């Protein structure tokens, strides 16, 4: 699929999509909750659908209603010998420890870029928890057999916090008592805040000791309970809408909670620092262009903000410096190099200097033919940058957005953007 974006202005109001970070964690909690869970404002991205597929394979019954999912579960009871997590990094890292609560042998696999991402974390940690594991030289597929036995362990938190998220769910639901998960060099702390928030909502108790140790005293959920959970608006997808507003607005974005623990809420600080016309309110954010100037930003704890930050920085006068490049290698693409290459086609110079990215902005963009590299955030970043470029921009493999924000192009159109979609003939 190709998307052709014409230069133009945006105006109007749009609702942010549902957070896949929140949605996927809610699916995990609903599986582990022995009872009925109602999930309101559910997402429908590819990653969200993959999470629902996983919990169904593990025994949950899912009924879809109008803006609500009803999930009935008795815990992890695999009905199949294989589970596929799609292309969801969070899905594979979070659900694998949960799957290991079962004593049945299970094959865990994924698709696309997930097949090349490192999974040797499980090779190292699972034997310490009584789990048999075999990987494909540190890659998928994984063959595992539990049951997981919660014990005090020490893990490396520098590659991804998602492994810790999975262990926290598995320990909590597995009845961990008097044991700790100790973590060295934890990155993306806000995502652990979100995990702890969901665990608490469903009645599980975990003591966070300064993000260096997570202690389980025992207790928590015993009897079956009916739960209700509302999925938050997505700051990750919403960041692209907000940057679009700063470049080509003014627009209003609804459905984003400024009190959220989501890491990508930090986009507000970047928008403020660069001089965008920003007015946050309760569940509503007004955003429009200002005299945009270069800014400095540390994205170590929110690496998914790199693509929208780069799109923003291209319109900011001067050299913007973004820290945290080391977090970009194991995404859907190698995002540091991909951003450099694809934005280079639009005339933007991006320098990579160790852990820092330098974007030389304010010099105008030229429409070009760019490629998503099958990465949803690259596709959205290019689309947003194209809104004020000189000439048309064509995004190849534009359907990559379906991973997290399938309504993205439609939402741009609702705000007045001219987006022409060309689908391949089958």
Go through the PLM ranges and name each one.
Residues 1-426:
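Short, structured segments at the rim of ligand-binding sites
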